[in-house]
């Protein structure tokens, strides 16, 4: 009888662990070298789909965890440790490269510290730097949102729920509001129906399914984290649009100066936020493939 009870309890514990395990979406080459992508906020794992073609071309298995769905009890260090544990479950003792976009760069950097020397390279695309450093808020398109999160968190939460309502009822209006101040080549993207079809489901997913996770990410971003930057000694590469008004280019320069492991910063003239992501994606994949000497997707598939 005791054996049966032990077996049932063990099965229940295993089931609970499986249910709490972070889900992820993968793109590119399923048997390629693992690269973990950290989407922006707002954002969702589907944001990573732009890497699918490039991942296949360069033999990379690019995955994105649904981190906004993580247990809401996970805050601060526990949140980043949980992400690191999920990545370790995937790669075991192997090496992994990380790519962060926008606020996802903050999460990627924090998580890298819990992965230690398992991280080969860290690529930060349009990274958002700590707001307590520099005069960044005035030059940010979303400066009001971040200012509310820092100074009036209850009002920020209320605003987020209003955005959630828009995402449910009129997602196209939410798209227009968020991109009303688009600059540089992001302006061209906003007139592209394919881009709207790409980004609208991402916004709906974030503000509907993962709203509380989004609020957590923003709250953790606006809190002080400068000291963590000084601990990032992994090989780091920064990609930034010169016309970015979501993450002003000064943020890239600040991070390049503060990250001990920063190897290179590429500032792309005319590019802004999402346009920088689209432009840098194939370049990042090519660089990772050349460093790892991985096999392209077609060449890796067996012939029958």
Residue ranges of predicted features:
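Alpha/beta-hydrolase
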Residues: 143, 149, 156-227
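Catalytic active-site module of serine/aspartate enzymes centered on a nucleophile-bearing elbow/loop
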Residues: 262-304
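Flexible "cap/lid" loop of the alpha/beta hydrolase fold
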Residues: 122-161
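Conserved HGGG/HGGXW glycine-rich cap/lid loop of the alpha/beta-hydrolase fold
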Residues: 22-72
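Short beta-strand/loop motif that positions the catalytic acidic residue
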Residues: 232, 238-240, 244
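Conserved hydrolase catalytic core segment
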Residues: 97-138
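Conserved acidic catalytic loop of the alpha/beta-hydrolase fold
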Residues: 80-97
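Conserved alpha/beta-hydrolase "acid-adjacent" motif
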Residues: 245-251
